[in-house]
A protein has these predicted regions:
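Structural detector of well-ordered beta-strand residues that form the stable sheet scaffold
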Residues: 3-5, 25-27, 103, 122, ...
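Beta-strand-loop-alpha-helix segment that lines the small-molecule cofactor/substrate pocket
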Residues: 1-3, 14-26, 136, 140-182
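Oxidoreductase and adenylate-handling cofactor-binding alpha/beta cores
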Residues: 38-57, 77, 93-100, 179, ...
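Rossmann-like dinucleotide/phosphate-binding beta-alpha-beta segment
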Residues: 67-158, 174
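Short glycine-/small-residue-rich Rossmann-like dinucleotide-binding loops
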Residues: 9, 132, 138-140, 166-167, ...
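Rossmann-like dinucleotide-binding domain for NAD(H)/NADP(H)
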Residues: 159, 166-271
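Phosphate/diphosphate ligand-binding glycine-rich loop within oxidoreductases
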Residues: 1-56, 68-71, 75, 162
C-alpha cells in the first residue's frame, strides 16, 4: 500500500502514525463542499428556528396549533461560528447576507471576514454567552473533543439553537440531550453524532450486546435525541450535492494521477 486517497476533507478515521511509519501517503479532497455544507447548516438552523419539521408533522397529522409553532427570525440575531476555515467562512458570508451579527472563534483570524463581513472574533466563553445561534465547523482534534460539554451548555442562552455539521465528537451528546430536555437551550440541528455508525450499520445493530459501554450509551442517547421535537438529525449528508460529488471525483482522480506522476498534492501527513 502506497497511497490512501480520501474522498473527504477529514482524516481523523485514518491511523496517521501507522501511515508515517510505513511510508503511506494520505491525500484528501479539500474544498469540495465549502458552500454545500454551509448551505446545509443554514437549512438545519432554519428548520429548528422556524419549526419546519414540527409544522409538517402536525399538519400531516391534522393537529395544527399555531401557538405551538411560533418560531424565531434569524435577521438581526447573533450567530456564533466555531471554526472559520473554508466552510465556516462560507457560512459567515451567508449569515452576513441575512443581516446577522457574527461572532467567530478560531485561532486564526481572517481580515477579509472582519473587514467585509463584520465577523468579530472572540473567546469561546463570550461566544457561548452572547450567541442566539451557534454553528460548528471545526475539525476534530485531540484538544477539542467534547468542547461543547455540560458547562458549555450552562453558559448558553436558554433560547439558543446549536447546529453541528463538523464532527459528532465535538459535542458531548449526553450533555446536549440533558441541556435540551432541561430547557437550558432551545434546540439543535445535527448532521453528525458521536457513534453515528451505530444508527444504520446492521452489524452494530444486531451486535448491541457486544458493544463496549461507551458505544452502547451513545447509541441509546442518539435514539433519545430522535424523539425530541426541537431536534433534527440528518445522516451526515451535509456534503451530499451533485456539484460537491463531482468536485470530489475530480479531486480524487487528480490526486491519484499526480501521485502516479511522482507528485503529491493535498497531502495530509509528512512522510
Amino acid at each position: 500500500l502506497k497511497l490512501i486517497a480520501l474522498r473527504s476533507v477529514g482524516f481523523n478515521h485514518i491511523d496517521t502514525d501507522y501511515c508515517k511509519e510505513h511510508n503511506i501517503a494520505v491525500v484528501n479532497s479539500p474544498g469540495y463542499g465549502n458552500i454545500t455544507v454551509a448551505e446545509f447548516a443554514l437549512a438545519l438552523l432554519l428548520n429548528v428556528a422556524r419549526k419546519v419539521t414540527e409544522s409538517y408533522t402536525d399538519y400531516k397529522n391534522g393537529c395544527v396549533k399555531p401557538e405551538n409553532l411560533i418560531g424565531t427570525e434569524l435577521c438581526g440575531k447573533t450567530v456564533g461560528i466555531v471554526g472559520l476555515g473554508a466552510i465556516g467562512s462560507a457560512f459567515a458570508k451567508i449569515a452576513h447576507g441575512l443581516s446577522m451579527n457574527i461572532l467567530g472563534f478560531d485561532k486564526y483570524e481572517k481580515e477579509e471576514l472582519k473587514q467585509n463581513y463584520g465577523v468579530k472574533y472572540t473567546d469561546f466563553d463570550t461566544l457561548l454567552k452572547e450567541s442566539d445561534f451557534i454553528s460548528i465547523h471545526a475539525p476534530l482534534t485531540k484538544d477539542n473533543y467534547h468542547m461543547f460539554d455540560e458547562e458549555s451548555f450552562k453558559k448558553m442562552k436558554k433560547t439558543a439553537i446549536i447546529v453541528n455539521t463538523g464532527r459528532g465528537e465535538l459535542i458531548d451528546t449526553k450533555a446536549l440531550y440533558d441541556a435540551i430536555v432541561n430547557k437550558q437551550i432551545a434546540g439543535a440541528g445535527l448532521d453528525v453524532l458521536e457513534k453515528e455508525e451505530t444508527i444504520t450499520d446492521f452489524d452494530y445493530i444486531v451486535g448491541l450486546n457486544r458493544l463496549d459501554k461507551f458505544t452502547l450509551e451513545q447509541t441509546i442517547i442518539n435514539s433519545q435525541l430522535f424523539r425530541l421535537d426541537n431536534v433534527i438529525v440528518t445522516p451526515h449528508t451535509a456534503f451530499n450535492s451533485r456539484e460537491a460529488i463531482q468536485r470530489i471525483l475530480q479531486t480524487t482522480m487528480s490526486n491519484i494521477n499526480e501521485f502516479s506522476s511522482g507528485n503529491i498534492q493535498n497531502n495530509v501527513i509528512k512522510i
